[in-house]
Design a protein with these regions (language model features):
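Thiol-based oxidoreductase modules, predominantly thioredoxin-like and allied folds used
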Residues: 21-22, 42, 53-81, 87
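Short cysteine-rich clusters marking metal-coordination/redox-active sites
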Residues: 7-10, 50
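Short Cys/His-rich micro-motifs in 6-15 aa windows
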Residues: 10-19
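Non-catalytic, surface beta->alpha helical segment in thiol-disulfide oxidoreductase systems
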Residues: 89-123
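A short beta-strand-turn-helix
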Residues: 19-38
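Short pre-active-site segment immediately N-terminal to redox-active cysteine/selenocysteine motifs
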Residues: 6, 35, 42-46, 89
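Structural micro-motif
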Residues: 34-38, 85-94
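Cys/His-rich microdomains that often coordinate metals
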Residues: 1, 14, 54, 105
């Protein structure tokens, strides 16, 4: 972790090589104000394909950061945000650039490399 960029105020690492957990309070802050692309996994704890993809998504953070911020949003806990973005099936990956959704993919990816390749293809 010592190799990545650090916060100018608290000096903690900005990227931790694992997905950031988003909630209602942090979603707009990270999506709307980010100067780098943000890849969000919309998921739920009861979803089998979501659980199957979780390790690959975790590994994808290490492949994509710091060029892309990787985050997760639990649609059960944050139903209003899921409704706002018309999430109809999970898992759904959405890529945001400058606060705007630029790509979306419903369904589970098998590998971190597949997630990284899909993400990079939309930048």
């Amino acid at each position: 972790m010592g190799q990545g960029p650090n916060c100018g105020h608290c000096h903690q690492a900005l990227f931790e090589q694992h997905p950031l957990t988003l909630d209602a309070a942090s979603f707009d802050k990270h999506i709307g104000r980010s100067h780098i692309p943000v890849l969000v996994d919309f998921w739920a704890p009861w979803c089998g394909p979501c659980r199957m993809m979780a390790p690959a998504f975790e590994q994808a953070a290490g492949l994509l950061e710091p060029q892309v911020r990787v985050a997760k949003l639990n649609t059960e806990d944050e139903q209003a945000i899921a409704a706002r973005f018309h999430i109809r099936s999970i898992p759904t990956l959405a890529l945001f650039v400058n606060g705007q959704e630029v790509a979306r993919q419903a369904g589970a990816f098998r590998t971190a490399a597949d997630i990284a390749e899909w993400t990079r293809s939309h930048l």
